[in-house]
Swiss-Prot record:
Glutathione binds at K24, R61, F73, C86, D87. It holds the Pfam family Glutaredoxin. It comes from Rickettsia conorii (strain ATCC VR-613 / Malish 7). This is Probable monothiol glutaredoxin 2. InterPro entries: Glutaredoxin, GRX_PICOT-like, Monothiol_GRX, Monothiol_GRX-rel, Thioredoxin-like_sf. PROSITE patterns: GLUTAREDOXIN_2.
Amino acid sequence: MLENKNFKFIENEIKNNKVVLFMKGIKKSPACGFSGTVVAILNKLGVEFRDINVLFDAELREDLKKFSDWPTFPQLYINGELVGGCDIARELYQSGELEKMLKAYTR
């Protein structure tokens, strides 16, 4: 099997950053409402996170879907694990679970 450069990039990012958001746009200027919602949640919680814009690299978008087995964006990773997209992040935030997860892994 050939080595996938995007898989290596993804693995490196989620290994070296406690919180990573693969999103449409950037945290200062989200390009879709779903990405904007997750950025707003993370900002409300005061979390530093690595944002990676997937809009301009179709190959990265497709490889990320394969890597995560998750078909949509944004994709939120905490401590190397996929948490999910906008709906899951919102539900976890509203229940208080997201804050607990972030405190456990970002201290």
